[in-house]
Regions:
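Juxtamembrane interface at the cytosolic side of transmembrane helices
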Residues: 7, 21, 137-176
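Cytosol/matrix-facing amphipathic helices and coiled-coil assembly/linker segments
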Residues: 12, 37-126
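Transmembrane alpha-helical segments and their cytosolic interface motifs
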Residues: 20-28, 119-152
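Aromatic-enriched hydrophobic runs in primary sequence
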Residues: 23, 31, 47, 81-83, ...
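Hydrophobic membrane-insertion alpha-helices, especially the h-region
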Residues: 25-38
Length: 176
């Protein structure tokens, strides 16, 4: 094939209206893919951070439970010991036990809230990642539409992109 024939063939392909439409569609899908991918990564990060915070709260809860247990033991020991000083110490340790029980309940509640936040972020991340997959498939099918010059492939790509955007948009419906 001569250089002139090759240039004419490229010019013919460049003027193909389907290729232009598919190319524009690919650009739009790529922009949507970027938005969905970044959103998915943000949700995954949020999920992991919330889970780590919940884990920290549970560790704090265990530390408070240990202190409560030690104060309870100390109170029992002081109650068994005769004397005014021992009675005062026993009362002090009983107050500590009450304080640690109350703090433990608050910490436990906070840990459960963080676990719930993590679960919600995880659900959102999964939907965004599936949306990302459908958008990636749409780009591949757009490429096939350009190569095969078939409108059916272009329409399939648009449907795949619609599914991807739709799945991604459902993150706004996840409340718990």
């Amino acid at each position: 094939m001569s250089v002139n024939e090759e240039l004419q063939e490229h010019a013919h392909h460049a003027s193909d209206p389907l290729s232009k439409k598919v190319g524009a569609t690919m650009a739009i899908i790529a922009a949507l893919l970027a938005i969905v991918a970044v959103s998915g990564h943000i949700m995954t990060t949020e999920e992991l951070l919330s889970q780590q915070k919940a884990s920290d709260q549970w560790s704090y809860y265990q530390a408070k439970s240990s202190r409560r247990y030690l104060s309870d033991v100390a109170s029992d020991l002081m109650s068994a010991t005769a004397g005014e000083t021992a009675a005062k110490l026993a009362e002090k340790y009983k107050k500590n036990v009450e304080k640690y029980v109350k703090e433990g309940e608050e910490i436990q509640e906070k840990a459960k809230e963080l676990e719930a936040e993590s679960a919600i972020a995880g659900k959102k991340a999964v939907r965004l990642h599936f949306g990302e997959v459908f958008l990636e498939i749409a780009i591949v099918v757009c490429s096939l539409a350009i190569l095969t010059k078939r409108k059916l492939a272009w329409h399939a790509a648009i449907i795949s992109a619609g599914v991807g955007v739709g799945l991604s948009a459902t993150v706004f419906t996840i409340l718990h």
